[in-house]
A protein has these predicted regions:
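Conserved ABC ATPase signature
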Residues: 163-167, 171
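Helix-to-loop junction immediately C-terminal to a conserved catalytic motif
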Residues: 77
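Conserved ABC transporter NBD signature motif
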Residues: 85-93
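Short coil-to-helix segment of the ABC ATPase nucleotide-binding domain corresponding to the Q-loop/switch region
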Residues: 123-130
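Conserved ABC ATPase "signature" C-loop
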Residues: 243-244
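Conserved ABC ATPase "signature" region
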Residues: 20, 25-35, 92-93, 130, ...
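A short, proline-enriched helix->beta-strand linker immediately N-terminal to the Walker B motif
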Residues: 182-186
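ABC ATPase "signature
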Residues: 248-249, 257
């Protein structure tokens, strides 16, 4: 099957500081994170990121704290502005969008699921799930019907009139996923979406996401620091260190052929046979 690139990151750099453009040549010449901070009092967020994210696939961006993974995902909808580089969505450079077009892209093309759930406590589960449609100005009846459908799909049928504080963490995150799906966006950005959950609930949420993805074929960009989660979810895995891509590719390939000592340390404790067997079972016939 022919793949279609949905999101492209090309030569993407992010330097945090008051004069990022002036220190960019130093970074491009090879200056590292520590030297940049010591010498110029700027912080290196991303260095020369080149990633192609395919339509209908889950791209997982993984790394330790401070690796740049959350910085990366916030560039896709321009919550963070890059220092240099291109961000293409469906072939359109996001950096060239007007304020109006950027707002339209955020409303219609991308949805986001956060680690801390980001639910409005004074709104019911139904109202939270329907939020994207409310912002779009759809009739209330249409909003509620669509939100009810997705709440039922994520296992929250009957909880429409509850408030977030009445739900467990796992249930609150199901509301977050229902809200993202209700928006009917092509692209879902999931920033450490399951990291705050207990292990068993986390596994359930991973299974739910994979189950929905079989049918919906969304383009999902998923951020995590957990290798087991990354290997379970990823069609394409991108591993970051100090703001740069260390290795990327199909998860099994990275697992069997790590190209860097940093990656070798990550995968050393993984049961390769179990992971390969699980991913083989998950492949459609």
């Amino acid at each position: 099957m022919t793949q279609t690139t949905k999101v492209s990151l090309r030569g993407l750099y992010k330097i945090f500081g008051n004069d990022d453009k002036s220190v960019l040549p130093h970074v491009k010449a090879g200056m590292g994170k520590e030297e940049l901070l010591t010498t110029h009092k700027h912080v290196l967020g991303l260095r020369d990121i080149n990633v192609e994210m395919q339509s209908g696939e889950i791209t997982v961006v993984m790394g330790l704290s401070g690796s740049g993974k959350s910085t990366l995902i916030r560039h896709l909808n321009r919550l963070i502005e890059p220092t240099d580089g291109e961000i293409l969505v469906d072939g359109v450079d996001v950096m060239n969008l007007s304020t109006t077009d950027l707002r339209q892209m955020r409303q219609n093309k991308m949805s986001m699921v956060f680690q801390k759930f980001a639910l409005l406590p004074h709104r019911t589960v139904l109202q939270n799930a329907a939020m994207a449609l409310d912002i779009k100005g759809l009739p209330t009846e249409e909003q509620e019907q669509e939100a009810k459908n997705w709440l039922a799909r994520v296992g929250l049928g009957g909880f429409e009139n509850h408030y977030p504080a009445q739900l467990s963490g796992g249930m609150q995150q199901r509301v977050g996923i229902a809200r993202a799906l209700t928006s009917n966006s092509d692209i879902m950005l999931m920033d450490e979406a399951f990291s705050a959950l207990d292990p068993l609930i986390r596994t359930d949420m991973q299974d739910l996401l994979l189950e929905l993805q079989v049918e919906l074929k969304k383009t999902i960009i998923f951020i995590t620091h957990d290798l087991d989660e990354a290997l379970k979810l990823a069609d394409h895995l991108v591993i970051l260190k100090d703001g740069a891509v260390v290795q990327q590719g199909e998860p099994q390939g990275i697992l069997m052929n790590p190209t860097d000592p940093y990656i070798e340390d990550f995968v050393s404790d993984i049961n390769r046979a179990r992971v390969l067997r699980v991913r083989s079972v998950m492949q459609p016939l």
